[in-house]
Amino acid sequence: QEQLAQQHGTNPSAAAIRAHYAAQNYETLIQLTALRKITATAKLTHAIEWAQNANDQGHKIVIAAHHRDIVQTLAAELNSPMIIGGQTPQKTETAKTEFMTNPNCMNLIISITAASHGHTLTASNNMLILEAPWTPAQYHQTTARIHRIGQTQPVTIHNLIIPNSIDQHIYNTLDRKTQNTQPAITNSTIQQILDNSN
């Protein structure tokens, strides 16, 4: 610990080292959040045009994003209802009902954290992920809003990614985490165990 503390110019006590790394992690988190926001903002125009083109072809779209103001901007630009944190349950239900029952309501904008559980949005079979979450579980919960019982059409998930940006890093992280959570024992592993036991 003393050597590590000397390298970082900190007090050699464990508490001081933890505090030092916590401060570094906090700063990194702030930078990542800023990068995500900048990247999402850069994608807004393309996302709006993409949704309008899809709407012109008769497709209803669910657009998922992370940042509150990104969700609000999309909802305003596309004149669409939204599901966002802090809404009353009545507003959330009204937005959902409008999207599900009104044939002229072509888009629903959702906050990934506010709408990734407990909502059925099967009026659409297309989702645009503008900002991906960090975990495979949250990603799959979000996409499951349109891919669930009651969906009668094939589902397509569109991921809007800027190459060589924080987007690419997030999707690489999602891929790595997904691979790490795959079952360790497969059918071939079971067969090998059975073969070796004879």
Residue ranges and their predicted role:
Residues 60-64, 72, 79-115:
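Conserved helicase ATPase core of P-loop NTP-dependent helicases/translocases
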